[in-house]
Regions:
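PRPP-associated nucleotide enzymes
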Residues: 1-154
């Protein structure tokens, strides 16, 4: 990634598959103290891989998803256009109630907008992410690595 393509981000933080796997396992180890969970709700798409790793490590078999759009861009498949800061649930979770006993997993909490939207739907769920930026850190219950707000993670 060139400096020009970073845009608003002063730093870049490339994450290999191996590093993501190691860090997601570390997330699972931190979550072990919070067991039992009824299951996992992965925030698509970024939370899918970490959720699978966490589920395997914690021996959780029930995995649901919630699909949330929170970044500006047009998606040709469903023609969603949004401005940054708006959040839209494309596919809700099948979990009933307030989320008590459930674990929500995402790869990154950035501004916290997605996390706040999901938290509003499932206020009693335990929210975990692999990476957290300062603006969204307070929304998650458990995370592994904090990165600065001006860092692009890819």
């Amino acid at each position: 990634m060139s400096d020009d393509s970073l845009g608003q981000f002063a730093k870049s933080f490339p994450v290999s598959w191996e590093e993501l796997h190691r860090t997601a396992k570390a997330l699972a180890w931190r979550l072990a103290d919070h067991l039992p969970f009824n299951g996992i709700i992965a925030i698509t798409r970024g939370g899918l891989v970490p959720a699978a790793i966490v589920a395997r490590e914690l021996e959780l078999r029930v995995i649901d998803t919630i699909s949330v759009v929170s970044y500006g861009a047009a998606d040709e498949r469903d023609m969603v256009q949004k401005e940054r800061g708006q959040v839209r649930v494309l596919k809700p979770t099948q979990v009933d109630g307030d989320g008590a006993g459930w674990l929500i997993v995402d790869d990154l909490v950035d501004t916290g907008e997605t996390a706040r939207a999901v938290r509003a739907l499932l206020p009693q769920a335990h929210f975990a992410s692999v990476y957290a930026k300062p603006a969204g850190r307070s929304v998650v219950d458990t995370f592994v690595t904090e990165v600065s707000q001006d860092t692009w993670i890819y």
